């Protein structure tokens, strides 16, 4: 497993006014601190450890209140993990802002370190504005009221004997039955996701991308995505 590192917060980032009361180290699945400024400060330490690249958790902006849809032990949680994006062009305020991110990449490069972005092309968070107002009728596979649940059967995508139902649920099912599944067969969705990746590369100078939940996305999308990059 990859080691997980949490580096301290500057005071303004502890509990941002736009998303209050989501940082509490005594509660599981809350923000526990750690921001981009803290990572910048510790870059020499990471360099001395022999680290060559930083793979950060997704820095997309996430829901600014407790998540009442995704729960833990029947209690609402925060989207501390970063995989429930509400703005694919925003930086989560608990971590910092775009300027801080650009400074991090620049500082890492000065030390010969690379920065990897964790992206999510498969789904959005359940609180994204698109869920209630999708840009196109086929933006998502299904709706919050009616959709398939993901059955995690990745093998079906390579097995000609797999049932169409299992294959469809694997590609179009909502992750954990709560994360709205983007329809990459919609040309506008495809264009948006590719342009978003190109924007992050250009805006930050990042060095690599890790795609979350990539097996649940049509392979022809990845063909176009990789060709564009």
Task: List where the protein language model places each region.
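Short catalytic-loop micro-motif centered on adjacent basic/acidic residues
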Residues: 116, 208-214
């Amino acid at each position: 497993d990859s080691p997980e590192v949490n580096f301290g917060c500057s005071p303004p980032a502890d509990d941002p006014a736009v998303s209050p009361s989501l940082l509490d180290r005594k509660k599981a699945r809350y923000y526990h601190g750690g921001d981009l400024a803290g990572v910048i400060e510790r870059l020499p330490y990471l360099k001395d450890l022999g680290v060559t690249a930083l793979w950060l958790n997704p820095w997309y902006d996430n829901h600014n209140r407790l998540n009442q849809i995704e729960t833990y032990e029947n209690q609402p949680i925060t989207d501390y993990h970063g995989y429930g994006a509400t703005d694919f062009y925003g930086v989560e305020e608990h971590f910092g802002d775009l300027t801080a991110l650009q400074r991090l990449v620049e500082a890492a490069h000065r030390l010969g370190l690379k920065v990897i972005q964790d992206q999510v092309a498969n789904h959005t968070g359940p609180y994204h504005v698109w869920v209630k107002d999708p840009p196109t009728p086929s933006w998502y596979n299904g709706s919050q009221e009616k959709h398939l649940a993901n059955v995690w059967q990745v093998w079906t995508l390579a097995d000609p004997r797999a049932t169409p139902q299992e294959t469809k649920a694997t590609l179009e099912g909502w992750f954990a039955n709560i994360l709205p599944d983007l329809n990459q067969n919609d040309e506008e969705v495809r264009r948006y996701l590719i342009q978003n990746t190109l924007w992050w590369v250009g805006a930050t100078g990042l060095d690599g991308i890790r795609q979350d939940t990539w097996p649940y996305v049509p392979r022809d999308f990845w063909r176009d995505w990789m060709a564009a990059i």
